[in-house]
């Protein structure tokens, strides 16, 4: 199949996943399943309201596309707020939390499903997000920062698995502000370590040369 046969488009992708699903199921299966159904109804209603479309689900995860970056980010914020309100009212010990990632990128259409880097990076952003938090890519940030009143925290260049991207946290609360190691800082650290090792070897080399020359000089004097 040639690239011209692949149906591509640019899309804003929303990815969310339940934190600690397996552990919740082990602790209280009935309460977890009930809570999951409630949360699914909440997210479905918000996505529909924002004119989004769910294109894939995985039990405790949801992937949706949106007509605009603002709509996707508004959905993420509203969902997290409603989940928090639900947890505050829930009398069980099962407090469900979600991570959310939002990205805009190139995707491949496969029937009603979407695939490709645009979706993969949204999933990586979701994995990078804090429980109850939202993490977005720089291209989404550039579109929404001046159109919304949300606060953001620049996380710099991040690498998750094989994907590298510039990420931002959307701060629902000041306590969510954090600092992560960036890919550039990791590169600098490797360079510094490499430089230090090189300096040691150079020092040992010249030390050996000087020691050899000293021995030769001593030998010549003895003769």
Language model regions located:
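Acidic, proline/glycine-rich low-complexity intrinsically disordered segments
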Residues: 209-223
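Catalytic NTP-binding/metal-coordinating core of nucleotidyl cyclase/transferase enzymes
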Residues: 2-75, 81-82
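Feature marks short, surface-exposed loop/turn motifs that line or immediately flank catalytic pockets
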Residues: 20-22, 106-108, 174
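Intrinsically disordered, glycine/charged-rich C-terminal tails and inter-domain linkers
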Residues: 132, 139-213
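Short, Lys/Arg-enriched, disordered terminal segments
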Residues: 1-6, 181-187, 218
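Catalytic beta-strand-to-alpha-helix segment of the class III nucleotidyl cyclase homology domain
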Residues: 4, 41, 63-165, 169
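A generic structural signal for short
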Residues: 31-32, 110-111, 186
């Amino acid at each position: 199949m040639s690239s011209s046969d692949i149906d591509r488009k640019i899309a804003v992708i929303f990815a969310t996943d339940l934190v600690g699903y397996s552990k919740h199921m082990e602790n209280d299966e009935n309460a977890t399943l009930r809570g999951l159904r409630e949360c699914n109804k909440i997210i479905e209603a918000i996505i529909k309201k924002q004119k989004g479309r769910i294109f894939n689900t995985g039990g405790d995860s949801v992937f949706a596309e949106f007509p605009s970056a603002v709509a996707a980010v508004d959905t993420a914020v509203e969902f997290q707020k409603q989940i928090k309100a639900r947890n505050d009212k829930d009398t069980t010990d099962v407090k469900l939390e979600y991570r959310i990632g939002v990205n805009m990128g190139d995707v491949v259409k496969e029937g009603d499903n979407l695939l490709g880097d645009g979706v993969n990076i949204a999933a990586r952003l979701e994995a990078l997000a804090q429980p109850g938090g939202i993490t977005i890519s720089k291209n989404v940030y550039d579109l929404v920062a001046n159109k919304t009143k949300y606060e953001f925290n620049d996380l710099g260049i991040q690498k998750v698995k094989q994907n590298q991207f510039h990420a931002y946290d959307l701060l629902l609360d000041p306590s969510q502000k954090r600092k992560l190691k960036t890919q550039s800082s990791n590169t600098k650290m490797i360079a510094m370590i490499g430089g230090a090792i090189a300096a040691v070897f150079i020092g040992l080399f010249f030390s050996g040369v000087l020691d050899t020359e000293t021995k030769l000089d001593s030998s010549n004097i003895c003769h």
